[in-house]
Every structure is written in structure tokens, then in C-alpha cells.
């Protein structure tokens, strides 16, 4: 298993173990792959592995926001078209037929991510692209990509800083959009 996948699995199990003892009405996951291009295949595999994990632990697609650059499965360099695997033995196709991508390609931006978290999206935005949480919701936010000390790159075009993320979480707290976040 990939070290990142192990970490993701441990994080997801910890999340749901903690939820078993608390009052809650809804569990949500926001899963973000921030890297494009073939040489970042591993980042798409990471976020899809986390997607499968949270689904297996009981979060329905209606409560998972999946943000993917979505260009690896159909990339001409992919020797197994339409598939994404996390290891060389190809034991499990992570892409499969049952994934629901909410934000894809150039929709995966810092602005859209912050708007999603803080509920600053227009009324025309479909429910599938909204984080419909409240003060009793638990939220897992998982992001994978390239970054450095206090920042993460989005598609090699822009960056989100630690302070931007902290500010978004503070706004979410003030708007009573979660009870706990992971």
C-alpha cells in the first residue's frame, strides 16, 4: 500500500471511530486532488483511494464532494485506458463506473474550494456541488497534491495558503457549518 493511502485509511477509520461516540446527524467528505497532468497520476490515485474508503465506511455520494482534475484515466499515456490504479498489481480499479465527480478539470480552483467550504456559491449551483452541512455535521477534508511549508498548489496555476484555509474553517465555524472537522 502507498504510505499516503495508509495515512488516509487510518484518518478515515479514526474519523468514524470518533463519530460513534458523539451526537451527529451527518458525515461529509470533501476530497480534493489539486494536481493535473500525467506525471501527477499518484495524486489522483490517492484521492480516489480515499473516496473508496469513505464510501465503504458509509458516507453516500450525496455527502461526498469530489474535486478531480480528471485527466489521468483517459490520458493517451495510460496503458489501461479508463482506469486508475494505486499500485502496480492493478488489484482494484479506483476509477471504475461508480464515481461521482462534482468538480472536474478547470473547476478545481482555490476560489471554488473556498466558496464550497464557506457556502458562498450562487443559487444556480446544483445540490451536488454544495456542502449542505449544519452545526451537527462532521466534515473530513482531504487534499492531495504538491505544496510546501504552509501552502498547497492547485493545478500549477495558483496556491492556497494555510491562513486561507484557517480563515475558511473559521468562517465555517461562525456559520455553524460543522461540529467537528478532520
Regions found by a protein language model. Name each.
Residues 2-136:
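Boundary/activation segment at the start of structured domains
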Residues 135-153:
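Active-site microenvironments of hydrolase-like enzyme catalytic domains
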Residues 28, 138-140, 181:
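Structural motif
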Residues 124, 148-182:
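Cysteine protease catalytic core and zymogen-processing segment of caspase-like enzymes
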Amino acid at each position: 500500500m502507498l504510505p499516503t493511502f495508509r495515512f488516509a485509511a487510518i484518518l478515515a477509520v479514526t474519523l468514524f471511530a470518533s463519530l460513534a461516540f458523539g451526537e451527529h446527524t451527518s458525515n461529509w467528505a470533501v476530497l480534493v486532488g489539486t494536481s493535473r497532468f500525467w506525471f501527477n497520476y499518484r495524486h489522483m490515485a490517492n484521492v480516489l483511494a480515499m473516496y473508496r474508503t469513505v464510501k465503504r465506511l458509509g458516507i453516500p455520494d450525496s455527502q461526498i464532494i469530489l474535486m478531480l482534475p480528471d485527466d489521468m484515466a483517459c490520458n493517451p499515456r495510460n496503458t489501461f485506458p479508463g482506469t486508475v490504479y494505486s499500485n502496480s498489481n492493478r488489484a482494484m480499479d479506483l476509477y471504475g463506473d461508480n464515481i461521482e465527480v462534482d468538480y472536474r478539470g478547470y473547476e478545481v480552483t482555490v476560489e471554488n474550494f473556498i466558496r464550497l467550504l464557506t457556502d458562498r456559491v450562487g443559487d444556480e449551483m446544483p445540490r451536488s456541488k454544495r456542502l449542505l452541512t449544519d452545526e451537527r455535521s462532521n466534515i473530513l477534508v482531504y487534499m492531495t497534491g504538491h505544496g510546501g511549508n504552509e501552502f498547497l498548489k492547485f493545478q500549477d496555476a495558483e496556491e492556497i495558503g494555510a491562513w486561507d484555509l484557517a480563515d475558511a474553517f473559521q468562517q465555517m465555524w461562525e456559520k455553524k457549518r460543522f461540529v467537528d472537522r478532520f
